């Protein structure tokens, strides 16, 4: 059975795990780290760096280094959250032809799924290196509060990376899975998973029940904010530093992309240090310059100051907790355990706020960086048939419905409904002899249709002429286990039907995905070719160095014609390694090897002669040593003076 890997595709960091025979393992990446920064850099020559290598060069290549692409996934360019991010990101966010928020790097227009696919591909390669076999299937996690188009876009990213996404599961649910399966007891418990990651916040109330030795994880309610996370905490600190520097020096660092990138790194580091210390210092020499010369940034930040900067962000995470508990029909006293997930949940003030709200200490025995990937891997093993002791009952985070007369939203599926699920409702025409209807699919909680998220629309035509209100049009909503919606409409009079798998009112078309898959495959092929070229070049250069050294040592012992032949081959090989033609490099290296055969024989003969001479000298020395040995008897003399 093919192995199904679990991937936590995070805003700031991503993590990979595999579960086999009930044992879960977090897989290290090529650099040996258990998490990978979700950072992608596009270089001049078409090369793409992912993770730590991309992060290391971010300051010098700020405009082409993309981070937090997950915050753009499934979003329109005009969305207010995207507009807010445009001001603070050093790279360029653009409006795609379909109205989506895309990114421009090295002159190329890139969709967020395409960028995220680079991270997924790195995860895939790490899994293949660890398992020693090809990996094509994965479970990928998303924030519980992701809407339909964001889920679809994440699935598209998997496809572009060459992965068959077997299931999209919610991050808090995955963390609950990791926590619940780790607990050996069979106690039923209700848990709250507070997940404050790099870019998104989720709260899920989950009931873990023991059913004859199997564990059932039922999500009772979920809530959240897809634009609240560690990146926002960093940004508050960055904005504060920029304002203070402007007051002191009169220079606005917002206009300098290189300075912004350095500030981002420094703010992230300072934030982490303030989780354990009371004060930290930000020191950035030569941050910028003006007519008077270079300017240096040195600033002390206390934990209290940082907490005051982000106080409202922490408060923003508590309101969804209140809503989720209410939706689940529970009070804080009903919660047995509070689990913290996501790197930002390490902040002491966040932990204090969670403790104050739930009235109990959050558990510290769950790794906030790895729990989500571990849960995804467990679900992967379930889907591959490797285990059957787990049942997952997740929910849809937002209500789903259609726009009806008067611009209102009529809900067919309420939020927090267990998925997969199906619902149907009969509607009719608004005018006499109406021959077609437009089904406008919406997601959200507002009564006014325009205030909700538009997921897409489709038409049902050829309706038989009839007075208004007479035709019967049955609309069916079907949500699969990934939380992705399929909608169909049927005229009960004529039997005519139309349907749509929601791709969002924007999203990537099938043709675009296919093109991106091909691009990604071509990139992988290019990477392979580059690796082979570098290997050939290294071999050729090692041979050139060796021949040059031998020629310097033994060239005078060769006849002129032989020496000339080697020097000509040497020159051709040196020219070849300057180019990018692997075949030419291999051919010239082989020609050099053949031409220098005689020289090699001389080197070998000389080395052999020296070895023999060395052995002879050693034998003589040994014999001489024996000649100097004197046989003698020793008499013990006692010292009476002791």
Curated annotation (Swiss-Prot):
- Superkingdom to which the source organism belongs: Bacteria
Per the record, where are the segments of Acidic residues compositional bias?
Answer: 628-642
Segments of skewed composition (Low complexity): 609-622
What does the UniProt record say this protein does?
Answer: Acts as a chaperone.
What's the protein name?
Answer: Chaperone protein DnaK
Annotated GO molecular function terms are: ATP binding; ATP-dependent protein folding chaperone; unfolded protein binding
**Which NCBIfam families does the record cross-reference, listed alphabetically?**
PRK00290.1, PRK05183.1, prok_dnaK
Q: Which organism is it from?
A: Neisseria gonorrhoeae (strain ATCC 700825 / FA 1090)
